[in-house]
């Protein structure tokens, strides 16, 4: 009986050591949604870098739901991951989730969207304010300084929507552009179509549209095509579908991010943190206008 107890104890100890060893090389990436090509590309970039650096990477989808996001983080603290990369569903709501990770001494890095009130070791993102300004200036250059424009906004409460809108309004307020309407379509293609249909009916003289992501831009494109109007549409993100539409002359332009690089840099910065190295609080990722 004593020998059996010893064997059981040894087995339990072996299991504990195995779990601990596995946790040491495990990171996680929590994405706001995987129902958007931009974030799928971000995931791919993170996975490639994690494999290169020898980490296991857990991927979780928050399905654009802050409560799901919170439960994802709670699950990861139980699983003992060593670092968490998070693309927040909401810049304010994510604070509670990040605090849970902080209490477990798990470093958190934000990707693309920031967190308003949380202890985050680094934020990896494009400068969305500059991107919004780039879109506004492109419209002025191609359509005219007095162009009548509409803006499709992303999910309210996200830093990306707030900052892209801020940048675009900087361009509008510093020019003779006339903003006819600005309404949210939640970064969603179908909502972009539906909202744009209503805005076209209310604003038949619109000349250009700035959509805060390519998914909304592509939805708006369908509405414009159905109306038969000649309206320039500028998107944001530089997704595969967005760039393809630009190359076909359907979208005027897209302000291109590099989501694969955002994901890759997130893992790279987390690796440095785990090795005790210092990382910048903000790691910028370059933007560029893609036009035909």
Which positions does each model-derived feature cover?
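Gram-negative bacterial Sec-dependent N-terminal signal peptides
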Residues: 1-23
């Amino acid at each position: 009986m004593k020998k059996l107890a010893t064997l059981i104890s040894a087995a339990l100890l072996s299991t504990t050591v195995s779990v601990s060893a596995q946790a040491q090389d495990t990171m996680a990436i929590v994405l706001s949604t995987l129902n958007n090509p931009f974030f799928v590309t971000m995931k791919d970039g993170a996975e490639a870098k994690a494999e290169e650096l020898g980490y296991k990477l857990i991927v979780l989808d928050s399905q654009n739901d802050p409560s799901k996001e919170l439960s994802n983080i709670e699950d990861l603290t139980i699983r003992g991951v060593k670092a968490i990369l998070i693309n927040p569903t909401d810049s304010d709501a994510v604070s509670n989730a990040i605090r849970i990770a902080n209490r477990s001494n798990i470093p958190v890095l934000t990707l693309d969207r920031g967190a308003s009130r949380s202890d985050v070791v680094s934020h990896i993102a494009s400068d969305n304010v500059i991107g919004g300004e780039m879109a506004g200036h492109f419209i002025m250059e191609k359509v005219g300084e007095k162009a009548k424009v509409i803006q499709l906004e992303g999910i309210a409460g996200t830093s990306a929507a707030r900052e892209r809108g801020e940048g675009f309004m900087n361009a509008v307020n510093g020019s003779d552009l006339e903003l006819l309407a600005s309404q949210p379509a939640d970064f969603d293609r179908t909502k972009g179509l539906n909202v744009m249909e209503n805005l076209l009916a209310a604003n038949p003289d619109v000349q250009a549209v700035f959509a805060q992501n390519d998914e909304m831009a592509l939805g708006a494109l369908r509405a414009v095509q159905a109306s038969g109007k000649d309206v320039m549409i500028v998107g944001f993100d530089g997704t595969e579908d967005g760039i393809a539409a630009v190359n076909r002359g359907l979208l005027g332009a897209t302000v291109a991010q590099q989501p694969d690089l955002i994901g890759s840099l997130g893992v790279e910065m987390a690796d440095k943190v785990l090795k005790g190295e210092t990382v910048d609080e903000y790691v910028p990722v370059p933007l560029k206008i893609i036009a035909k």
